[in-house]
Amino acid sequence: QQVEAFSKPWKIKNWGGPAMNPGLREQWQGKSKVLVTHPKSEEIPCVLSAEIRVPATQSPKLVLAVSNHPKGDWVLAVKIDGKSSLVQKVDQSKWQHIQLDLSDYSGRKINIELENRANNWSFEAGYWGEISIRRD
């Protein structure tokens, strides 16, 4: 429910880290309505997934705003139809704005998975300020 309140049509699996109190935050680092996730274990990432129809426009993009807990970091992995499209460490303790070109999938229905992977297993919470598809 909290994921849908944050951003439909995203679903979540392998939500862990009760000590990090995952869920929806009213505000974090100047953004409102922020989703906090945490990997289930060092080996099992928390996964946000959705089936999306990519707009048939010139340069559709997956747009993310992600951050980390000030005492930790995590690894963001993006998979499209099961294929790795991005692996990036999130460790700046500020919002990182990421745009992933979806032009190759224009007009198609795709499955996107956003993984919150562990990195050294210390304060691995992922903070999501935006997950959207833009039609630029």
What are these regions (language model features)?
Residues 1-136:
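Gly-Asp-aromatic-enriched flexible segments
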